[in-house]
């Protein structure tokens, strides 16, 4: 009976650990949704570039953070997507309730930051969408080194003209 009880306790502990790890690992669907949101709704690539290297779209000033070299942890990344970056940067806040009472950002409200509040986004995001973008950035961009042709094809699709030019050594 003692062995059975010990086995049940060990199994319960293993299942708890496995579910904890699974909860921290983004699902493939979350990453796919995050990619679509990064590309289309949030238009992150306009400033951060398709590869997240901070180069931006050809029409952007290219002054955004290089996400490939980011040292932000998950919670910090979520807060920046949700709240933007105060202080006159172009990084918008994607949570429409950010900076309000009860939804403080970086421990501050809109009254605390005044005219240094981040700009409004072109489209707001829901919590699930913010989580999905963070999952995509963490899975496909952060710590991945310089962008490759394979990265380009994963982002734009196989046969993309941009990726063909990248493969030929031309500027993106």
Where are these regions (language model features)?
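Gly/Gly-Pro-rich "capping" loops immediately C-terminal to redox-active cysteine motifs
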Residues: 51-86, 90-115, 119
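Sequence/structural segment immediately N-terminal to covalent heme-attachment motifs in c-type
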Residues: 28-50, 83
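Sec/Tat signal peptide C-region and signal peptidase I cleavage site
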Residues: 19-23
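Bacterial N-terminal signal peptides
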Residues: 7-18
């Amino acid at each position: 009976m003692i062995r059975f009880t010990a086995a049940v306790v060990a199994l319960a502990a293993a299942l708890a650990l496995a579910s904890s790890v699974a909860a921290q690992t983004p699902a493939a669907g979350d990453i796919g949704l995050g990619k679509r949101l990064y590309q289309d709704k949030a238009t992150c690539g306009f400033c951060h570039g398709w590869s997240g290297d901070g180069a931006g779209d050809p029409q952007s000033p290219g002054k955004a953070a290089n996400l490939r070299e980011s040292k932000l942890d998950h919670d910090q990344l979520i807060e920046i997507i949700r709240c933007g970056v105060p202080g006159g940067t172009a990084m918008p806040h994607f949570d429409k309730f950010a900076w309000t009472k009860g939804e403080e950002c970086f421990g501050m409200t809109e009254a605390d930051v005044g005219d240094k509040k981040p700009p409004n986004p072109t489209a707001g995001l829901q919590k699930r969408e913010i989580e999905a973008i963070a999952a995509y950035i963490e899975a496909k961009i952060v710590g991945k080194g310089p962008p490759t042709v394979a990265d380009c094809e994963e982002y734009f699709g196989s046969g993309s003209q941009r990726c063909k030019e990248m493969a030929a050594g031309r500027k993106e």
